[in-house]
Amino acid sequence: MTNQTWSPSKACADFVADLQYADIPAAVIDTMKRDTLDWIGCAVGGAADRSSQPIKAVADVLGGNSQATSIDCARRNVVLAAMSNAYFGHILEMDDVDRDSISHPATPNLAAAFAAAEFAGKQGKDVLLAAVCGFEIMLRIGAAITPAHYKIFHTTATTG
């Protein structure tokens, strides 16, 4: 018999495994759609900025199978597409901010959700569901560990 004690990791995993799109309130979906459009605008601007060149060069050198599309329209393996999109989304420092967690939740969550959804052949509702799950977990963990954590670490990187 296994020990079924509660843990924060198990609670997060259960939340993600159990949440269905139909369970998400309409107001949350509307907010997520708005946040997604905002992030896309930031990422498109970031991809066009000259400071995006290093990540593009790294992604090109690492190569891999063409599995997902980056915001700059390049086809990359799914991990490099997600990494590039996250980088692009944060370049201009105009992405969203959550004050309680001192983080930018859209960048890591939407970058990963879009790349993974394209790779897996999923639809828009799946992207929104994944993003809601990611935001919820990231923001709760971030709020629990800040502000002391933020004195040393960038919360977006450590909780996203």
PLM regions and their residue ranges:
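N-terminal core-entry segment
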Residues: 2-160
